[in-house]
């Protein structure tokens, strides 16, 4: 029975990759620009994202080791939802967007490496260690494909409707 559960984890991760990395908010720079942010402010917001990510990558990995992969994945989705809500609520307020970017970085940090580690451990426990690279490649393909799909879908919203992409992001995060 446990082996089936570990095999199930691998399949579930494909669904998680699909919904969690849809890429629907890929036009966030245009969104911020449409909401009154200058290029300088957008660059600063990007810096906040990457600085937060740099500072929190190792601590977020320690949380996964301390608690569980599942907990980190839940935290990732919750942070993604909160970040999207803040982006919608920002209405041109730099500081709200800054908080949203920091929380978005945490969302990526909580997922970064956690999915791969969970899939690897599940493959080992299910007796599929020798197939891990092909499983990992498949999941990477799902992730890349859905990011591309999300970008194409977001393209339909670029003329003043980019806020809808954050609602879609919230919905897909809830599904996950």
Regions found by a protein language model. Name each.
Residues 2-55:
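Helix-loop boundary and gating motifs at the non-cytosolic
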Residues 13-21, 92-105:
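Helical-face signature of the major facilitator-like transporter fold
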Residues 34, 87-88, 147-169:
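Transmembrane alpha-helix termini and helix-breaking/packing motifs in multi-pass membrane transporters
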Residues 50-58, 144-148, 152:
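Residue-level signature of mid-helix packing/kink "hotspots" within the transmembrane helices
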Residues 78-92, 97-98:
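C-terminal ends and interior cores of transmembrane alpha-helices
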Residues 101-143:
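Cytoplasmic helix-loop-helix junction between adjacent transmembrane helices
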